[in-house]
């Protein structure tokens, strides 16, 4: 973390998400209570810490299961939502089995594409509502949807219909707050 806030990763290929395990450190220590010798004390304890970890996690599968549980838990999801607006946005969506949902939309045609028929327009409305000032362009948003849907155990699917992209996404009633 930096300044007791989680670091923000914008990498969209999934490499960070597959490896990232989030630990929160939000108990801020005042300057008067900070131990100036803490780094040296921790360095002296590293061999003991390693022995303890090896003893507690002699079975690597148990350690792996605990890390996966933490990585995929509610607290980790909340942090992912705070750091990635596309992941936050996906909580307001339903993912269908087939690409028979909203059209992707985008471009400059605001008459043809509205928040009722365009996933990208819904995303832009969400970004404005959430006070997020840097929305992704249509292509980057579409790429970001696949890993964001996976965070919720869903799959993002698209298909081409008459030269347009149709998604497997519909909005939930929770979207009414920003539509």
Predicted features along the sequence, with ranges:
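Feature primarily recognizes SF3-like P-loop helicase cores of small DNA viruses
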Residues: 1-179
């Amino acid at each position: 973390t930096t300044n007791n806030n989680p670091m923000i990763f914008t990498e969209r290929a999934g490499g960070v998400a597959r490896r990232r395990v989030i630990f929160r450190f939000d108990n801020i220590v005042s300057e008067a209570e900070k131990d100036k010798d803490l780094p040296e004390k921790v360095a002296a304890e590293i061999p003991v810490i390693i022995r303890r970890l090896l003893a507690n996690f002699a079975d690597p599968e148990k350690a792996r299961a605990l890390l996966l549980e933490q990585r995929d838990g509610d607290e980790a999801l909340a942090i992912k939502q705070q750091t990635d607006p596309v992941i936050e946005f996906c909580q307001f969506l339903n993912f269908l089995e087939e690409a028979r949902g909203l059209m992707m939309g985008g471009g400059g045609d605001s008459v043809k594409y509205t928040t009722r028929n365009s996933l990208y327009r819904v995303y832009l409305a969400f970004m404005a509502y959430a006070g997020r000032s840097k929305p992704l362009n249509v292509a980057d948003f579409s790429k970001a949807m696949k890993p964001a849907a996976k965070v919720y155990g869903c799959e993002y699917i698209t298909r081409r219909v008459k030269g347009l992209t149709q998604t497997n996404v519909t909005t939930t009633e929770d979207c009414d707050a920003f539509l």
